[in-house]
């Protein structure tokens, strides 16, 4: 479960902090009500307000509730493990050196009572033979003096904070978000550098360790502040993170920066020197000039970090003012219980549900102005507000037909022209197939929607609420289409197709191959082949398989969806919005 933290780090078993920490003042919407006349005409008829849409007495509601509780229990268990970092002994060693844990460091940088949205909390889950909690690095967004920042904090309790391939991928993803949203970067450095046994996977390629420093340089040149606080070891290539930062802080005693540590220096030159004398805070703050601020201890260093952000002079921000909601912004809570999202979301992806029941529980006042409601009905499109910010919502209500794809492309064009952020609620098994669909140009219609999604320059946020299969993933702004943020519910599945469908296709191919080769294929062998295929697809479609590899930005409790969307919108709207130019639409 993606955690939204308050002033103190909370455990996975605790509830989220209250909505008051959001700095968005609740109240009655003071905007003119265009539906007031209609509401007076017919009792009980409210234009723009979604109905409840949920039968609480249905078997589906009950079974979904039970199934989701089991799924969330598994999620909480996984999160509890990663919150423990590298284990009790590693944490004790860290404490003995008067060092805070990475989430505690972030907590002390954040504004009091504010929220922190941690990204990719389960990165590296079961990816390697040895555990690598959170991929060895904590990343996320939160405010310092009202300015939303991107935090990247090495976890020294996990393999000494060294970089595995997934650590680098997670670090680069955080930088990608920061660059796009123009968020100041806060590097909390405590790392032994690259994990040497996997040097071939972390060092030489374009998206490897060197890309971290490249991104740091490019963001600095683009006016995006790069701030490093050295709280522990900063060795070899890792030394370039603070050296290339706009401003850097070093903590006395624990913070060190050197290209080669004492053992390597002795081996290479014969010189015997301590880590502090070789590259400690005194050396780099008074002699070399590598660092700019000398901190007596961690708390002092983190306080200096807050002051650096306070003194940033950046251009005026857009939209929600970068404070997770303007203090003067007025919004309405949804009319319906957001906790019911746990009972709406099906575990069986063959079970249909109306995406409007999700929309009604995540948008302000459950108000939704639907666009083209009677046309292309398997795709729901319309305008709403989330914490006062206008958004365009695109949600699946079945497979995509020609009409629904054209409707989606039209709506994306509208939002792009008006610079309205897009929220995709993805539950899609694909496009319609068959001779009639092909003759009607399903590929052409789908291409229009994919073109629109690809070219749209407005902020795009994707939530996978159920299935995410095949080309439907593409049209609904999957990972390849660079959404600003993308999260996944724990009941979701993502893959090129469902396991049963894949087994059917591959079985036909295998049967034909064996027939050509003159090999007899028994019924038992065929069933075993099918089972093996289904099992493989189910394993690889699992949300934990996805999130471990950073195919998304985190697995979230459905009940957190509204809060996560609000935080993501706050971050995404820090950047100036560009005009959109579309490619050639095949008519």
Curated annotation (Swiss-Prot):
**Mind listing the GO molecular function terms for this protein?**
ATP binding; cobalt ion binding; methylcrotonoyl-CoA carboxylase activity; zinc ion binding
Q: Which residues does the Swiss-Prot or TrEMBL entry list as transit peptide?
A: 1-26
> Is the keyword Repeat in the record?
no
- Location relative to the cell: Mitochondrion matrix
* Acyl-CoA binding: annotated segments: 367-396
UniProt domain CoA carboxyltransferase C-terminal: residue ranges: 333-579
**GO BP term (any one):** L-leucine catabolic process
Signal peptide span: none
Q: Which GO terms describe its cellular component?
A: mitochondrial matrix; mitochondrion; plasma membrane
Subunit structure, as described in the record: Probably a heterodimer composed of biotin-containing alpha subunits and beta subunits.
Relate the protein's function as given in its record: Carboxyltransferase subunit of the 3-methylcrotonyl-CoA carboxylase, an enzyme that catalyzes the conversion of 3-methylcrotonyl-CoA to 3-methylglutaconyl-CoA, a critical step for leucine and isovaleric acid catabolism.
Report the sequence similarity comment from the record: Belongs to the AccD/PCCB family.
Query: What is the designated name of this protein?
Result: Methylcrotonoyl-CoA carboxylase beta chain, mitochondrial
Q: Which organism is this protein's natural source?
A: Arabidopsis thaliana (Mouse-ear cress)
Q: What is the lineage of its organism?
A: Eukaryota, Viridiplantae, Streptophyta, Embryophyta, Tracheophyta
Q: Which gene encodes it?
A: MCCB
């Amino acid at each position: 479960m993606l955690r939204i933290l308050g002033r103190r780090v909370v455990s996975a078993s605790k509830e989220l902090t209250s909505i008051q920490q959001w700095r968005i003042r609740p109240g009655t919407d003071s905007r003119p009500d265009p539906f007031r006349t209609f509401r007076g005409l017919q009792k009980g008829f409210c234009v723009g307000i979604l109905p409840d849409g949920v039968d609480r007495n249905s078997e589906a509601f009950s079974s979904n509730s039970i199934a989701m509780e089991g799924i969330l229990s598994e999620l909480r268990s996984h999160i509890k493990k990663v919150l423990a970092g590298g284990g009790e002994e590693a944490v004790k060693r860290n404490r003995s050196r008067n060092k805070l844990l990475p989430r505690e460091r972030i907590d002390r940088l954040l504004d009091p009572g504010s929220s922190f949205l941690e990204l990719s909390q389960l990165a590296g889950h079961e990816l390697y033979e040895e555990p690598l909690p959170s991929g060895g690095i904590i990343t996320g967004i939160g405010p310092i003096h009202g300015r939303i920042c991107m935090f990247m904090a090495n976890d020294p309790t996990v393999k000494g904070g060294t970089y595995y391939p997934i650590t680098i991928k997670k670090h680069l993803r955080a930088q990608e978000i920061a660059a796009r949203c123009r968020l100041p970067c806060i590097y909390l450095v405590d790392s032994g550098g690259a994990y040497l046994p996997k040097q071939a996977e972390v060092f030489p390629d374009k998206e490897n360790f060197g890309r971290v420093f490249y991104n740091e340089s490019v963001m600095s040149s683009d006016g995006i502040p790069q701030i490093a606080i050295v709280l522990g070891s900063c060795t070899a290539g890792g030394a370039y993170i603070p050296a290339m930062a706009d401003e850097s802080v070093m903590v006395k005693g624990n913070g060190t920066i050197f290209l080669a540590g004492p053992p390597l220096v002795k081996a290479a030159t014969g010189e015997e020197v301590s880590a502090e004398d070789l590259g400690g805070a005194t050396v780099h703050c008074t002699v070399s000039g590598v660092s700019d601020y000398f901190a007596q201890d961690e708390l002092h260093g983190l306080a200096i970090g807050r002051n650096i952000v306070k003194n940033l002079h950046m251009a005026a921000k857009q939209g929600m003012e970068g404070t997770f909601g303007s203090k003067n912004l007025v919004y309405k809570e949804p009319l319906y219980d957001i906790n019911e999202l746990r009972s709406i979301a099906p575990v069986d992806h063959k079970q249909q549900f109306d995406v409007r029941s999700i929309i009604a529980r995540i948008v302000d006042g459950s108000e939704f102005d639907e666009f083209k409601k009677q046309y292309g009905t398997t795709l729901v499109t319309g305008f709403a507000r989330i914490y006062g910010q206008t958004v365009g919502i695109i949600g699946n209500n079945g497979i995509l037909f020609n009409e629904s794809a054209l409707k989606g492309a039209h709506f994306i064009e509208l939002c792009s022209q008006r610079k309205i952020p897009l929220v995709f609620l993805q539950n899609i098994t694909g496009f319609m197939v068959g001779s009639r669909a092909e003759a009607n140009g399903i590929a052409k219609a789908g291409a229009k929607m994919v073109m629109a999604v690809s070219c749209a320059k407005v902020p795009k946020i994707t939530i996978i609420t159920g299935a995410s299969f095949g080309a439907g993933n593409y049209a609904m702004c999957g990972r390849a289409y660079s959404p600003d943020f993308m999260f996944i519910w724990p009941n979701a599945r993502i893959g090129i197709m469902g396991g049963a469908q894949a087994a059917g296709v591959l079985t036909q191919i295998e049967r034909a191959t064996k027939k050509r080769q003159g090999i007899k294929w028994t019924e038992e062998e065929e069933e075993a082949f099918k089972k093996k295929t289904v099992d493989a697809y189910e394993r690889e479609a699992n949300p934990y398989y996805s999130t471990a590899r950073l195919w998304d930005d985190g697995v979230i409790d459905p009940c957190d969806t509204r809060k996560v969307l609000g935080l993501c919108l706050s971050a995404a709207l820090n950047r100036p919005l560009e005009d959109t130019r579309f490619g050639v639409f095949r008519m």
